Amino acid sequence: MTTWDKCLKKIKKNLSTFEYKTWIKPIHVEQNSNLFTVYCNNEYFKKHIKSKYGNLILSTIQECHGNDLIIEYSNKKFSGKKITEVITAGPQANFFSTTSVEIKDESEDTKVVQEPKISKKSNTKDFSSSQELFGFDEAMLITAKEDEEYSFGLPLKEKYVFDSFVVGDANKIARAAAMQVSINPGKLHNPLFIYGGSGLGKTHLMQAIGNHAREVNPNAKIIYTNSEQFIKDYVNSIRLQDQDEFQRVYRSADILLIDDIQFIAGKEGTAQEFFHTFNALYENGKQIILTSDKYPNEIEGLEERLVSRFGYGLTVSVDMPDLETRIAILLKKAHDLGQKLPNETAAFIAENVRTNVRELEGALNRVLTTSKFNHKDPTIEVAQACLRDVIKIQEKKVKIDNIQKVVADFYRIRVKDLTSNQRSRNIARPRQIAMSLARELTSHSLPEIGNAFGGRDHTTVMHAVKAITKLRQSNTSISDDYELLLDKISR
């Protein structure tokens, strides 16, 4: 067994499986007496390995080889010419292979899920208070000069299916619930209320429910819309003196999906109509799925009776995906586009774009378009040039002691409480949150983070990260606190 083989066994115990396979397994180490040269393939990889895992590598080699040694980091690929003993992590991990798979573009055609028609009537009633009552002005209303028929709802996009939704810890509960209601509508989780920030996949999940439910039962009457269109449909039904048709259409749905329901808050007439529509569907065992950017009782201006009804079923969140999931999303997106994307470039983009999935995909498109325009492969260097503004923001230094101070102030405790041995809930939970934030926002290793929190073991940090990730899925208060702290620290 070589020195590096011994080191690998020890290093593996200090890292998650993902970290080990992603960052440690791909490197090559050449040993020449007391000189250890770590080959990292490129500059970005070298900087990351050295900054995040350098101390761990050094201490492990010292433990296995002795203190008299020199470690050098190279941004070049290992040549394969064995001068002395070459120590490797085994076959190079596929994760950082520059080979990519190409497939055909998927169709983005849309299909209309439900299009009931109503005939327009020439007579209209006065509707001067539309802006105040419904949130729309006269410009949003249809007129007699438009087409002779008016359609309710919106079409579902065929590209939004469960297979194209990348699952991770941040969304797996929401995805599982969505799949259940698409197979057995009205039986479980009614209503299903999905909430989370913009660009995190709520609309994708909602439309995937509709598309899959249609496959399961082609005869199901499925209506997909958003709150803006729902308001517009209602206003126009009044304008056309045909509210009965509006009610007949929406209240006869087997599955009703409404995106961004928060926008009906404060719209008295529309909110009342939705309330009665909700009751009619619920009492008849029909499935209701809603999305919002906020938890129901946090939607300002939403009637209490609606908040209460939203709580009848299951409320789940979708949060910003972790690094592993962000990488998977980028690779899947490039795959779907039939584009070549080296895995190391995907990792670079994922590490530097942490806002939402929409911006993550936007960054990917920017890199792919630039590389194609310049007839270059989408390398890390190309990504660095394309995303220099984003990187500049992300490179703002975040220190563990700053995280500790912000968290301590937020929970009204002392910084020394976070590093103490106290295990009471009001201290232990903020400590876990601070550890999780340190893991996400800094380049420090698990042992380094543990040491900053009173000399704790790296396994304690791993446990804290896993615990907080799980709690953010099930505990709204913890999730909201974490997002607020993330925002405060990242400013």
Curated annotation (Swiss-Prot):
Top-level taxon of origin: Bacteria
Region (Domain II): 69-154
Binding-site list for ATP: 199, 201-203
Localisation per UniProt entry: Cytoplasm
UniProt KW keywords: ATP-binding, Cytoplasm, DNA replication, DNA-binding, Lipid-binding, Nucleotide-binding
Main subcellular location: cytoplasm
CDD domains for the chain: AAA, Bac_DnaA_C
Pfam families associated with the record: Bac_DnaA, Bac_DnaA_C, DnaA_N
Role according to the record: Plays an essential role in the initiation and regulation of chromosomal replication. ATP-DnaA binds to the origin of replication (oriC) to initiate formation of the DNA replication initiation complex once per cell cycle. Binds the DnaA box (a 9 base pair repeat at the origin) and separates the double-stranded (ds)DNA. Forms a right-handed helical filament on oriC DNA; dsDNA binds to the exterior of the filament while single-stranded (ss)DNA is stabiized in the filament's interior.
UniProt name for this protein: Chromosomal replication initiator protein DnaA
